[in-house]
Curated annotation (Swiss-Prot):
Extra remark beyond the main annotation: Member of the exu locus which is required for galacturonate utilization.
Taxonomy, superkingdom: Bacteria
Pathway in which this enzyme or protein is active: Carbohydrate metabolism; pentose and glucuronate interconversion
Catalytic activity: D-glucuronate = D-fructuronate; aldehydo-D-galacturonate = keto-D-tagaturonate
Keyword Isomerase appears in the UniProt entry: yes
Entry GO MF terms: glucuronate isomerase activity
Gene this chain is encoded by: uxaC
Biological process annotations from GO: D-galacturonate catabolic process; D-glucuronate catabolic process
Protein name: Uronate isomerase
Family of the protein in this entry: Belongs to the metallo-dependent hydrolases superfamily. Uronate isomerase family.
PANTHER family: URONATE ISOMERASE
UniProt-listed Enzyme Commission number(s): 5.3.1.12
Amino acid sequence: MEPFMGKNFLLKNETAVSLYHNYAKDMPIIDYHCHLSPKEIYENKTFQNITEAWLYGDHYKWRIMRANGIEETYITGDAPDEEKFMAWAKTVPMAIGNPLYNWTHLELQRFFGIYEILNEKSGSAIWKQTNKLLKGEGFGARDLIVKSNVKVVCTTDDPVDSLEYHLLLKEDKDFPVSVLPGFRPDKGLEINREGFPEWVQALEDAAAISITTYDEFLKALEKRVRFFHSAGGRVSDHAIDTMVFAETTKEEAGRIFSDRLQGTEVSCEDEKKFKTYTLQFLCGLYAELDWAMQFHINALRNTNTKMMKRLGPDTGYDSMNDEEIAKPLYKLLNSVEMKNQLPKTILYSLNPNDNYVIASMINSFQDGITPGKIQFGTAWWFNDTKDGMLDQMKALSNVGLFSRFIGMLTDSRSFLSYTRHEYFRRIVCNLIGEWVENGEVPRDMELLGSIVQGICYDNAKHYFQFQEEKANV
């Protein structure tokens, strides 16, 4: 029997063991999509205790605590931090089979050197031990990033953000990691969203452009894209909960924009038209600047109205959507490809039923120049599990090129989440090892090792081409 989460955790054959320890384990990390705070990175934020580092803002953990019967006061409420931690310690043993069980122990092992299993009995001692370490040297936000061998961090930023801390970090020669902005213009595309006119005003202020027409709106967006570019930004991200496409013209999109600013209700069809044209415009801009565009598709957000009113968004009340994506997605990609304006694109869906839709579609839009120009993004959110990762990788390898996959990201708000890359890398190595053991792939360790290192780091390095000397990538 294998020891619990020992050195060969998830590595079930000799080839996998060799690939992980000799090729994958020490590769650097490019975290090209996350929700870390650039302010906290710049200030090298320290944590008062393990609850602040682990449980604040982590809706993954909150969801299973609720499922375990933990009252909200111990999750997002006003219970003391030690009691919140003990509520988590009570939940962890019940989470076997959930990746959080493994991630929790990986984080304890890698960052704190704690190999004890977390439960109610060990909770008090682990609370004291982790807190003692957190109050010492080497546990600030920057320290945790450096300790994880991260070279690039791409945050998620609104177009109206000042990027103040990105710019300060860019000039900070004492920190060897590039912290780059990620352009997230969702508030500018959801025209029926409450607060849209106010956001347009914020965009006007940020871009220093008067916005009374759709033309001016697009000019302001372009100005902000170029500002992000000057700060080192090379990625955009779009939360497209429902994939839409509706053929339209710039004039019609302009009419819809004007109607909304004047308080007229925008129909569902007009909303689709506005989003379509604005996305097409942004695609052309991203292509010009050689950015990578990310689509996160098919999330069903804020499904519990009572708790949404009580706690707000991003608190653990989202789920998978099951909208059809194939036709609107291909129509959008095709519409910009026809104009030679399709940028590098990474497609994620929260619904695993879309795996083969995406895996098959991406190769319809490869350009024969950039390897893996259109990517099937790594398993996301509820699919960020051993089975979910394997399903995504197998779909990609069955109909595309697994070897050109740009690999893992954290998509996290926690500075302790970089062990997810280790979890992912072990799964990659074991999958390839299984192919070898089954006689499906030759045991050419030089070839397989280079493929593993590509998926871990090298492919992302060549794909994004982040221009930042201090990152040394």
